[in-house]
Amino acid sequence: MSTSGKLTLITGPSGVGKGTLVNQLLERHPQIWLSVSATTRSPRQGEQDGINYFFHSRAGFEALVEQGGFLEWAEFAGNCYGTPRGPVEQQMAAGRPVLLEIELEGARQVRRSFPDGFQIFLAPPSFDELERRIRGRGTDSEDAIQRRLTRAREELEAQQEFDAVVINDDLESALNQVETLMGLG
């Protein structure tokens, strides 16, 4: 299967290693275009518009929602996040493989508007290992950790909705599986 002009989506619970896997994938396959999300939150130190996120006012974001400008969008912690439709469609039309790294609810929305997209669920080897990884970050309060774990349980229950499930036990092995699923040589 060729990934040329195809949409692939990767999702999975917080702490499963989506970001690490996607960064490695992009390093190995620079032809892949990673979608940049839009948000209403303020830029953090060092973040650039159009590189890290497309930064919008609440009104500007809502106008794009009304115009059907997002493949998916959601509100989280008081801010809106979404995947702009235009750039994704432009890259696909140009024949580039497109990759989205988004959360479960966004993946479900993309499936409705892009049923031909290939969806991969990245899963931990065990729930205990996922908890160890989340705690190992050392950045969250116990309350935040418990919220992440509760959400992770819900997300893991949804993995059968996806075209493929890849267990991220060993990064190299998981990368090889994703490359095979995406048809990358």
Curated annotation (Swiss-Prot):
Essential for recycling GMP and indirectly, cGMP. It comes from Synechococcus sp. (strain CC9605). It catalyses: GMP + ATP = GDP + ADP; dZMP + ATP = dZDP + ADP. It is found in: Cytoplasm. One of its GO terms (cellular component) is cytosol. Residues 5-183 form the Guanylate kinase-like domain. Signal peptide: none annotated. Pfam families: Guanylate_kin. This is Guanylate kinase. Belongs to the guanylate kinase family. Keywords: ATP-binding, Cytoplasm, Kinase, Nucleotide-binding, Transferase. The gene is gmk.
